[in-house]
């Protein structure tokens, strides 16, 4: 009976102890192992925080810098939300104590570059969100140590360059979002090692050039979004190099140059059973001027007619020229034969006289 009487007191004391470790401006809930410090005016990381906290929300504050080993007292964190702050710098090893961290959200901040030590100690991370920052270059060292990452969102930055092997250690990555950046070309080696990638979003860039073998390593790709870029032409083998069971490709809102070559490419792609051009009916022509605004599917059967007619005209012209040459040669041959015959006759007459 005494134990039953003492137990509530112990629980109450434990709760008070937990709350005592909760910083001002935060709401700490022991049962859920979470601390909510969102939507405040925090300029520095709050302290203290319960050491058993697994979910920490610091979003929508005024944080500008994440120092070295910033979360040393909350090593058990699994989810860390730092989105919608003013963060412009992250020290090397800032997240290194968080060996159980699964989700890190740094979206909508002011981060311009990822240092060599940015990912130190984050081998357990499964989801990294860096959308709407100010990144311009992804270096080969940017994402080291992220061997178990499944989802990476880099959309709506200002990325113009992705170095070869920037994603080199991400053999488990399944979703990569690079949409809304400033990429102009995709070179071979950019997606090396992404054998598990299922979704690749590249929409809303300035891509006008794609190397033929750039998608070859993506042996699990199910969705490729290239809509809203600057593609005028595409090589058939660029997509043929995708050897997945089924890949859906989005290509609308590109300034296509509609000609016989383009028609042939899409006709061939349409015959490949594992490739699905989901928005083919929405593709429109930007060039030549007389086809501007027309849907490709409305004119695709006519694009090669002019070329065919031209080829026929050239062929007929060549045939006529050859026949005419043969006829002329034959006439000349006969003319020479008659002339020779007349000359021989004249010679015989002169001898007789």
Predicted regions and their residues:
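Leucine-rich repeat
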Residues: 29, 43, 49-52, 64, 72-76, 87-88, 96-101, 112, ...
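Eukaryotic tandem repeat interaction scaffolds
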Residues: 140-230
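Membrane-proximal C-terminal cap and juxtamembrane stalk of leucine-rich repeat ectodomains
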Residues: 3, 9-22, 28-34, 247-353
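Conserved hydrophobic beta-strand positions in leucine-rich repeat
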Residues: 35, 54-58, 77-82, 101-106, ...
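LRR N-terminal entry segment and analogous cap-like coil->beta motifs
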Residues: 30-79, 83-86
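Recurring C-terminal helix/loop segment of individual leucine-rich repeat
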Residues: 44-48, 68-72, 92-96, 116-120, ...
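Consensus "Asn ladder" position of solenoid repeat domains
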Residues: 40, 61, 85, 106-109, ...
